[in-house]
Structure formats: C-alpha cells, structure tokens
Amino acid sequence: MGIIKYKPTTNGRRNMTSSDFAEITKTTPEKTLLESQSHTAGRNAHGHITVRHRGGGHKQYYRVIDFKRIKDDIKATVKSIEYDPNRTSNIALIQYPDGIKAYIIAPKGLEVGMIVESGVNADIKVGNALPLANIPDGTLIHNIELKPGKGGQLVRSAGTSAQLLGKEGKYAIVRLTSGETRMILLTCRATVGTVGNGQHELIKIGKAGRKRWMGIRPTVRGSVMNPNDHPHGGGEGKAPIGRPSPMSPWGKKTLGKKTRSSKARSEKLIIRHRKSR
C-alpha cells in the first residue's frame, strides 16, 4: 500500500493524503455476504443522544466477517483482497471446496491464491486460525477471542498485532498493541500474523468534509458553549473554567479522572496495564 499526496489546488486538498489501494484486487463486494445497516445518528430508542458527534455520512453495506473461524481442517483459497468501509483494515474473500465463501480480516502478506485453514492441526503461517494452546510462544497474532467460540474481539485494526509471550496453566500470556499484558484462555482462538493495511495511520484527512463523509459531526469546545449546555460555558469573552477541575458535559470530573473500575472481573486477568499515552 502506498500513500497518494495531492497538489495544493485548494486549502482542503493541500494537506490531504489517501491510500493508493494497490493491494485491492476486486472492487465489487460479494453480494451474499452483504447486509444493510441503518444509522441512528448517535440516538437511542428514545431519541436521546447517547453518542455525540455522530450523524450523516455515506451509506454503506455491512460486510459479514467470519471472526470465529470454526470451519476446521478445511483448506480455503483466497479469492480477492477487498476494501471495507466499515473498518480500517482490508478484508479477504476466501472460498472453501464446498463453494461456501466468507470474509476474513486480511493480514499482512496474504495474497490471492494462497491457502488458509483453521483448527488445531493448521500450520503456523499467516492467515491460519488456531487455539492459543497450539501457537508457539513469540508468535505475532491478531483477531483474538476473549471467550472461546465468541469470535475474535481484540487486535482487528489496520497494522496491529499482539505477541504471545508464554503459557501458564490454562491461560496464555499475551502482550497487546496498547502495551497491556493480560491472560487469555488457551482454548480461545487467534489468527497468525499482523493485520494488513499498516500505512493507514499515515493518511491525513485534510478537510472537515471528509470527516462528514464518515458520519462524524463537528466537535465544539465547552468553553464556547452557553452555561446550560456545558459546565465550562458562559462568561464574558474567553472566561476561565471557574471550577477546581475540568468537567465533562455532564458535570463529572475529567482529564485525568480514572474511568476503569478496579473491581472489574477482568482485572485479575490483567498482568500489566496499558502504557500511559
């Protein structure tokens, strides 16, 4: 994948970059693996805003991804590498000998014509999915399950990978992209390799309108709002916050306030918390 830079024909174009989509081999998705999706603009069933700064954006079909990879000991052929508007990584269309097709997250190095499989007997090579118990220590992995059979939940974004550090009892010790080291059951599955499209982080949005295409609306500072809209609002001109600590829009302390409960059940599985950003 390469990065395209544009001539500064307009202010929005000046700093914009995009992918050249060199890895994409097919532009039309598999119709049998598409589902329609409706956008709620961040509202719940009562019409209340539960997630701010959402709304608009281009219509998209959802590509049904096989995160579980439970079709064991059957070799599948990679038919195409495709773009997915719903995620940062690319996806790969695979086909089994019985004609069934599925989408998987496309790892780095996966190409059309390669063979992938899943199960305890699968080889340790890019794109194969195995239980953590069958993966050697030191292997880079992605699409990791947290509960056996639930499907991969961790490490699915473009360019990310986790490393299997070792095994202890019924748990595997995995270091995640964030720097967090945690224990995961050995019966949980993961896919070998690093997620592809690693240069995605180098793309510069360039203009506000491109964010609107993604369904993201503007974010406004609390200090320029009215006092009935935000605790920082009101005052004459550029007024200070006027409180001992910065506040969230709902009046809770923020900027440094810890939000994770120390009593969370998963806390006992975390050996080392993620690195401070």
From Swiss-Prot:
Region Disordered: start-end pairs: 220-277
GO cellular component: large ribosomal subunit
InterPro entries: NA-bd_OB-fold (IPR012340), Rib_uL2_dom2 (IPR014722), Ribosomal_uL2 (IPR002171), Ribosomal_uL2_bac/org-type (IPR005880), Ribosomal_uL2_C (IPR022669), Ribosomal_uL2_CS (IPR022671), Ribosomal_uL2_dom3 (IPR014726), Ribosomal_uL2_RNA-bd_dom (IPR022666)
Molecular-function GO term, any one: rRNA binding
Source lineage: Bacteria, Bacillati, Bacillota, Bacilli, Lactobacillales
UniProt-listed GO biological process terms: cytoplasmic translation
Subunit structure, interactors included: Part of the 50S ribosomal subunit. Forms a bridge to the 30S subunit in the 70S ribosome.
Stretches with biased composition (Basic residues): 254-263
Role description: One of the primary rRNA binding proteins. Required for association of the 30S and 50S subunits to form the 70S ribosome, for tRNA binding and peptide bond formation. It has been suggested to have peptidyltransferase activity; this is somewhat controversial. Makes several contacts with the 16S rRNA in the 70S ribosome.
Family in the record: Belongs to the universal ribosomal protein uL2 family.
Species name: Latilactobacillus sakei subsp. sakei (strain 23K) (Lactobacillus sakei subsp. sakei)
SMART domains per record: Ribosomal_L2, Ribosomal_L2_C
Gene it is expressed from: rplB
Protein name from the UniProt record: Large ribosomal subunit protein uL2
UniProt xrefs under Pfam families: Ribosomal_L2, Ribosomal_L2_C
Keywords in alphabetical order: Ribonucleoprotein, Ribosomal protein, RNA-binding, rRNA-binding
